């Protein structure tokens, strides 16, 4: 079963959007198999955003993600990575369609509510960074055969 990493960023946590976001993924039929509310260390933030290390906005990314609590999650289901990206909407909320998380709630590129893995490789790497194996549950919902 495909898994992805999603994170409600500090702006989403501060604006009380955790429940709204979780609800959207549950209603889509995806299964939450790991979740935690946490503060992010600078070390974890730098490792998470390592691919952007040479970009001018790297410091701002790290500062923002460490500025307040985040809600880190692991979701599973068929095509969860691609579907989650579509549900999130484009990175820039100006370009994000209404009905997407960013289109409905984000205020700027820098404060765009949510992060999601963009590929199976990213999902595996990010889940491993943010969660121990024991923190990701493995169970089958009885409704799964109808989704």
From Swiss-Prot:
Residues bound to ATP: 9, 57, 85, 91, 102, 112
EC number: 2.7.4.6
Source organism, top-level taxon: Bacteria
Cofactor field: Mg(2+)
InterPro entries named among the record's database cross-references: NDK-like_dom (IPR034907), NDK-like_dom_sf (IPR036850), Nucleoside_diP_kinase (IPR001564), Nucleoside_diP_kinase_AS (IPR023005)
Major site of localization recorded for this protein: cytoplasm
Any one GO biological process: GTP biosynthetic process
Membrane-spanning intervals of the chain: none
SMART domains on file: NDK (SM00562)
Cell location: Cytoplasm
Keyword Metal-binding: yes
A single GO molecular function term of this UniProt record: ATP binding
Reactions it catalyzes: a 2'-deoxyribonucleoside 5'-diphosphate + ATP = a 2'-deoxyribonucleoside 5'-triphosphate + ADP; a ribonucleoside 5'-diphosphate + ATP = a ribonucleoside 5'-triphosphate + ADP
Record has Phosphoprotein as a keyword: yes
Catalytic residues of the enzyme: 115
Keywords linked to the UniProt accession: ATP-binding, Cytoplasm, Kinase, Magnesium, Metal-binding, Nucleotide metabolism, Nucleotide-binding, Phosphoprotein, Transferase
Function text: Major role in the synthesis of nucleoside triphosphates other than ATP. The ATP gamma phosphate is transferred to the NDP beta phosphate via a ping-pong mechanism, using a phosphorylated active-site intermediate.
Subunit structure: Homotetramer.
The family this protein is said to belong to: Belongs to the NDK family.
Protein name according to UniProt: Nucleoside diphosphate kinase
The organism's taxonomic lineage, starting at the top: Bacteria, Bacillati, Bacillota, Bacilli, Bacillales
